[in-house]
Amino acid sequence: MASATAAAAPGEAEETTRLRKPRFSFEENQILIREVRAHYPQLYGAQSRRVSVAERRRVWDSIATKINGITSWKRTGQEVQKRWNDFKRRTKEKLARVPHSTQGAGPAAEDAFSAEEETIFAILGPGVAGPGAGSGAEESRAAASSQPQASTASTQRYVLSEDRRQDRRADTPAQSKGGSSSPESWARPSCNPQEAKERESTSPAAMQPVQLPRLALSPPLPAPPPPPTALAQVAPSSPSPTPPRPTSAPEQSLDFLRAQQETANAIRELAGTLRQGLAKLSEALSALLPLLPGTPADPLPPPPPPPPPPPPKPVLPPSAPKVELAPEPVSVVAAVVDGAVVAARGVIISPRSEEGVPKPLPPAPPLPLHDSPPHKRRKGFPTRKRRGRWKSP
């Protein structure tokens, strides 16, 4: 007994010194969910923006007080809020796994929602819960309703593909001999009666867009074969000695020859019309020409005489080419020798006498050989004495 009490004493001491509180019980969870649902507009709803943080904290403290009324330990408002956040997060994660678990052969047992989770779905609303809001039966019903929608889309695609295949087989002679053309016969592989009903209801609407290409494509296929056979049957019976025409596009050759002949006839008619028009035009001109002013005998007035040629210009003697002689510069210095003016270059200007008879001039003295060019200065003019080196201008 002493040992048992001694063993129990340390355990009680450990329990009293234990800091971690026990998990929330079922009753505590029920109180938490009920109180959060009652105060949800103040905590998370539209009114939460107008509620201060202190007021929300007081709401959580009041919820914790109600939970502490049924337990021997005390929980704070922060612990209660954390428990609600964890509860909500786990429920959302479980809801996110629902579509993946319902795609198999049957519903998974571990994903069945409890009453608490269903209540949380109702609190959070359809925006968060999605198709699983409400009870578990509604969840399974929503999952079952999502499957027929997907199956309906696949069934419609299947019916369209089968209808196209049926139309192709109907064009072939093997299909025309025997076979059912009803869409129900192609829908037999489906084992779901609901899908069969939906396919029967949607098959007329699906047949309309499919029949259009069949009606558009069916005439070209059977149309080309009959003309060659008809020509082949008529060609031997024709009494014409010409050999049978080749079966490759006979109608095109006939149409081409016919069009060519029509074109030639049209050209001939146009040429005849042009000839008639020209003949009528010539007759009209021949009738109108005599009425024009002019001699009646002449069909056309004579051409006007050409203008007279211009009078010939007087012939002038050829003018001698004008040669300009550069005048030699003559220095101003001149001397008077025996009544005659002698220039620097030796030109003698004889003075006229009073009677107008020129006087004989004596021969001019010979000029020195070392005479400088006329453009150079003579010694008689004073020049500036240059000293030093020449400076560039």
UniProtKB/Swiss-Prot annotation:
The keyword Transcription regulation applies. It comes from the Eukaryota. It is found in: Nucleus. Coiled coil: none annotated. Ubiquitous. Highly expressed in brain, liver and testis. Moderate expression in heart, lung and skeletal muscle. Low expression in spleen and kidney. Signal peptide: none annotated. A motif (Nuclear localization signal) lies at residues 87-90, 376-379, 384-387. Residues 173-184 have a biased composition (Polar residues). Residues 1-11, 142-157 have a biased composition (Low complexity). Gene3D superfamilies: Homeodomain-like. Residues 1-21, 125-254, 290-323, 348-393 are annotated as: Disordered. Its main location: nucleus. Changing L274A: Reduction in homodimerization. Abolishes homodimerization. Changing L281A: Reduction in homodimerization. Residues 160-171 have a biased composition (Basic and acidic residues). GO terms for cellular component: nucleus. The keyword Transcription regulation applies. Transcriptional repressor; DNA-binding protein that specifically recognizes the core sequence 5'-YAAC[GT]G-3'. Dimerization with PFN1 reduces its DNA-binding capacity. The proline-rich region is required for PFN1 interaction. This is Myb-related transcription factor, partner of profilin. It comes from Mus musculus (Mouse).
